Amino acid sequence: MATPREIKKRINSVKNTRKITRTMEMVSTAKAKKATNKVNAAKPYADLTRELVSSLSSLASIIHSPYLRKPDKIRKVAILAIAANRGLCGGFNSNLLRMVKNRIEELKSKGVEVEVHAAGKKAISFFKFAKVELVTSYTNIDDKAGSKEANDLASYFMERFANESVDSVEIISTHYYSAANQKPETTTVLPLQMEETGSKGSSGPEVLYEPDPKTILENLLPMVIKTTFVKIILESVASEHIARRVAMKAATDAAGEMIKLLTRGYNRVRQAKITQEISEIVGGAEAIS
């Protein structure tokens, strides 16, 4: 049985750990709030850009954009896995990387060649341990990541797709739906999918395009791809902070419960020791008398 001093030492150790996890929870809460504000601010722009492209979708067959290329057969796919640079965020990294692993195996089973790209130190170390060769790796997808990092990534993959080095580009990342709902998903960013909105003959205000709809659409397509990258990165960062906040809250609560259990154990051991000492004193007194 542990001595009161040993139990007291362990209680103090758990209390110190609880201070750390509580601080990390508070920091993650603040960062999650800031990150979700960025997601919410970027969403209207991304939605409006998509809506404008959809309104011009009937022109997709007459423009010659490399980003609309649809190969007869998918021979090679580029997968970008976006994980975190740090841990202590529950199943955020493990769930995502498991999905990446399954997707790679699924494509290879169909005879499709896969090239893997990783963003985040956790993803990089995962693939290194699994002996998966990475074509590119990035560690700058974090709180400071924004349009510049997203545009750099988008430009690289747009070039890979345009010169037919790959037939499809997929991003596997954690999507943010709400503060209580985030989950890893696969997004096919290239070839660009043209979604038609509305029906033919539907009433609505007449829209005038300058210089002309075809030119506007050709310039909008790269913009849509880049805004998709921005959206994915911002959602991944926000989801990471939410996952870390939840994990640190769970750790703080668990530490609190452990402190209660250890305190009760400490009191029992201390009480037993006092009772034993009293019994020894009484026994000694009776022996003398």
Curated annotation (Swiss-Prot):
This is ATP synthase gamma chain. Pfam families: ATP-synt (PF00231). Keywords: ATP synthesis, Cell inner membrane, Cell membrane, CF(1), Hydrogen ion transport, Ion transport, Membrane, Transport. The gene is atpG. It comes from the Bacteria. It comes from Leptospira biflexa serovar Patoc (strain Patoc 1 / ATCC 23582 / Paris). One of its GO terms (molecular function) is ATP binding. Coiled coil: none annotated. Belongs to the ATPase gamma chain family. It is found in: Cell inner membrane. Its main location: membrane. Produces ATP from ADP in the presence of a proton gradient across the membrane. The gamma chain is believed to be important in regulating ATPase activity and the flow of protons through the CF(0) complex. It is a peripheral membrane protein. GO terms for biological process: proton motive force-driven plasma membrane ATP synthesis. F-type ATPases have 2 components, CF(1) - the catalytic core - and CF(0) - the membrane proton channel. CF(1) has five subunits: alpha(3), beta(3), gamma(1), delta(1), epsilon(1). CF(0) has three main subunits: a, b and c. CDD domains: F1-ATPase_gamma. One of its GO terms (cellular component) is plasma membrane. InterPro entries: ATP_synth_F1_ATPase_gsu, ATP_synth_F1_gsu, ATP_synth_F1_gsu_CS.
